[in-house]
Amino acid sequence: MTKPKIFIDADACPVKAEAEQIITRHQLDLVIVSNGGIRPSLNPLVQLIIVAEGPDVADKYIADTAKAGDIVVTGDIPLAAKVISNKVTAIRHNGDIFTTDNIGGQLATRDLMADLRAADPFLVQSNRRGGTTAFSEKDRSRFRNSLEAAIQRIKRGN
């Protein structure tokens, strides 16, 4: 039985508590990676890693540390692309699973939206930015189900 380690890209992550509940039930290690502002957990299974401030420092730590069979929780598409290429499971906060089949399209969409924002300075300043909808209880439930399923799959060796 493989024992995965769970990594959370913690800055702006709304499901840290849910992940901690699940890892406690399974007696797995949880590594929360942040550049600060996160309260340490009293749970001995939870390790808080504070990295230097700067763009993508937490992402680099996670990408360099997570191994095949581990799970990464992130909303960062480039980080997800890096880790899934190393056979790490990547789960979005809302429970969506990043896969080798869907990551290319997500990276392309992300890059296109960045180009559109850069080309329209008024878009950045207006309410037309788009963005995501509010994080819901349904999203939390989907995340819990996805993390639970990923842990079970890895433990079975699939």
Segments the model singles out, each with a brief description of its role:
Residues 2-158:
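Nuclease catalytic cores that cleave nucleic-acid phosphodiester bonds
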